Amino acid sequence: MIYVTGDCHADFTRFNTKIFSEQYEMTKDDYVIICGDFGGVWNRFEENKHEKHWMDWLEDRPFTSLFCEGNHENFDRLYSYPVEKWNGGNVHKIRPSVIHLMRGQVFQLCGKKFFVFGGAKSHDTDGGILDPEAPDFKKKKKELDKEWLPYRVNHISWWKEEMASKEEMEEGLRNLSQYNNEVDFIISHCCATSTQKQFVDKTFSADSMTDYLELVKQRVNFKKWFFGHYHDNKNIGPKEILIYEQIIRIL
């Protein structure tokens, strides 16, 4: 069995047995895929008690939790985990059955091919990205707080790695070509540019990530594409599904 859900932002209560009772029939060979903004690796320098509790709690679920990165992850820590090969692609194992599916990889799950490409551009940055080491950091932060302008702080609440590198994009295309540009499912955080234009306002504009996913959309044959990021649940045409708090079975 494979289920898909959207952004968690470190709130994993949707996976308790009262809400997600289907897990009683699941084993570690069954999967729940989170479409980015997992948020379980967030504390600045190391895993704190709160994170440990929830990562251990997820590990104790009968299923295996998988996630792609969103734009709200601590990439310094996430990328500090050893890279391992798992089911055909590169991963970071937060726990034995809590696994980060790295960008541009193709995974074999339950006999189906999944192309995964997480990440997105943060849009809650009207006040800019602040440098915590800058001499005027506290002054700028105070001014922005007073004006109620949203901002992010470098290496504390924002990381440039939220956006894929050129190398990751190229690796993704190479991996897809090895499968003749044909997969069963695509998992991402944001979506292709043409898809995004169908349902969002001016808050979200095209960028290098959505343009790359547009290239994937035009080049690759796929059955279904699931993505998060936009905090809603809706079908965008017959093949693309925006998902947030719902947990839906796909296999």
Role assignments for model-derived ranges:
Residues 5, 10-109, 200-214, 218, ...:
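Core catalytic region of metal-dependent phosphoesterases/phosphodiesterases
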Residues 96, 110-203:
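Active-site-proximal loop/helix segment associated with metal-binding centers of metalloenzymes
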Residues 161-251:
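Internal alpha/beta domain cores that form substrate/cofactor-binding pockets in large enzymes
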Residues 9-10, 38-41, 72-74, 119-123, ...:
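Short, solvent-exposed loop/turn segments at secondary-structure junctions
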Residues 1-3, 105-116, 185, 237-241:
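Beta-strand-turn-beta hairpins that frame and shape the catalytic cleft
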